[in-house]
Amino acid sequence: MARELKEVQGIIFKRQKYKEADLLAKIMTKQDGIITLIVKGALRPKSQLSAATLNFSMGTYVIYTSGHGLSNLRTYKEVKQFDGLYRDLTKNAYTSFIFDLIDHAFVEYQPLGKYYDLAVFALKKIDAGVDNEMITQIVQMKMLSAFGVEPELRHCVICGKERGVFDYSIKLGGIVCSDHFAKVNSRLHLTPKQTAVLRTIGLLPIERLGNIELNSETKKATRKAIDRIYRETIDLNLKTKKFLDEIKLF
């Protein structure tokens, strides 16, 4: 494919120094996927491109691309900054992990579709002050399908029962009802409420998810469950997750 100028709408989420005065910046877009951009001269003092490519800048960018490999950022049109993320280390850490997680589920230029909408949802909610932990758990549960390990949350994986008391089994890939608790050694021994939270945030569309308020004990239990699901099914080793976990200790 020949190189062409193209307008893309997206979110800058990662940048690093490239050569003396240039940057490499990653942008997440809905139709064109994740693109690595060369931003020439961005490290020079008066560069307008530097501010437009700060992490978590969302806007319209004009790029020179062939649809594979590195593309070049030529200019930008409208860019929105999320100031709340710059002023708050914790918000920044949660958002960085979310975008890193999505980044690892796709190859470059692979369309993101609904997962881009998920990224925008998380970015806006965290910037607005909605519970960082719950937004992150929502994203983690919904991203399992992107990694090819979507759990069965609608009904018991053994008998198909949709109502009742449930627990979660990583080995079986979803929820199991109380009729089978004695036979399923791999269940996580979550409370009915904790399992219900996983089902709710995993199944409901993001536009129907309001502010989910949970006590710290429930959030801690669901976080441990989700982390274990990821560890035993995907085994990602993300630096952003390690940093986030370290922040939570303080």
Curated annotation (Swiss-Prot):
InterPro entries in the cross-refs: ARFGAP/RecO (IPR037278), DNA_rep/recomb_RecO_N (IPR022572), NA-bd_OB-fold (IPR012340), RecO (IPR003717), RecO_C (IPR042242)
GO biological process, one term: double-strand break repair
UniProt function note: Involved in DNA repair and RecF pathway recombination.
Record organism: Lactobacillus helveticus (strain DPC 4571)
Family: Belongs to the RecO family.
Annotated GO CC locations: bacterial nucleoid
Protein's name according to its UniProt entry: DNA repair protein RecO
Key words, A-Z: DNA damage, DNA recombination, DNA repair
Pfam families: RecO_C, RecO_N
